[in-house]
């Protein structure tokens, strides 16, 4: 996968381009030794990357959350879990490809995985509806969660959506009802639920698989009731004010952790999760295992009581 750079990363991109050019020259003519210059530029690039990512603002984090090369749910399933078996359909209307789910093993322990999937190529993005689920997607998710409860399996969800699909067909089939039902049912499921925002956490589309006992966010993910562009369009009548909106919305992992709306922030590799899938997956796996170990200590009554108190605490300082 070719590396793509965001606008604020352009100085880094220029250095990386110079490094690649020098490598190409060195490979074409073995008599030319450019190792020292390449090493110098690599060091400079690493320092610039460190400096850039130490001071990202909320709008830049929003761009990172949407990075086209960012790992999606299926990438984490491939890197973290074994024996994944896809389960499809809501048993009522269709199999929504914007939601993927199924049975897998985490360190030999059976779990149920559910997550949004955006797609990379144009064809796959259309197939996945750009990660925006319809009601049948959320009903599929609920079916899998209820199956997990029957077999006493922990539920692990990965959140990455700009929001639930707002199309006419989705509304006709009960989009708001499907989301609301998931919120209610997830609050009462008798098995541990671990939710992780891996990219965009957009409004009710994210919440519909986001009620749990542990709520985590990747370092450069976002979680909000609306996109910065949408907020800017409403408040300032212009999407051009998106960067201002992002700052006031408090959508970053660090801000939400300060507000105690999430439990932990999972560190990303320098430059973002897309720079190193293996490192990111290892960091996420460690968090999931630690959360499962923590929740395993609780009996069912305590688990549900803690989840209820978490939900009731939202909105209170």
Curated annotation (Swiss-Prot):
Which keywords does this Swiss-Prot/TrEMBL entry list? ATP-binding, Cytoplasm, Fatty acid biosynthesis, Fatty acid metabolism, Lipid biosynthesis, Lipid metabolism, Nucleotide-binding, Transferase
Swiss-Prot/TrEMBL GO biological process terms: fatty acid biosynthetic process; malonyl-CoA biosynthetic process
Could you tell me where this protein is found in the cell? Cytoplasm
Please give the catalytic activity noted in the UniProt record.
N(6)-carboxybiotinyl-L-lysyl-[protein] + acetyl-CoA = N(6)-biotinyl-L-lysyl-[protein] + malonyl-CoA
- Top-level enzyme category: transferase
Task: Recall the GO molecular function terms of this protein's record.
Answer: acetyl-CoA carboxylase activity; ATP binding; carboxyl- or carbamoyltransferase activity
Q: In which pathway does it act?
A: Lipid metabolism; malonyl-CoA biosynthesis; malonyl-CoA from acetyl-CoA: step 1/1
**Its GO CC terms?**
acetyl-CoA carboxylase complex
Q: How does it assemble?
A: Acetyl-CoA carboxylase is a heterohexamer composed of biotin carboxyl carrier protein (AccB), biotin carboxylase (AccC) and two subunits each of ACCase subunit alpha (AccA) and ACCase subunit beta (AccD).
The family line of this record is: Belongs to the AccA family.
The name this protein goes by in its record: Acetyl-coenzyme A carboxylase carboxyl transferase subunit alpha
Q: Which gene encodes it?
A: accA
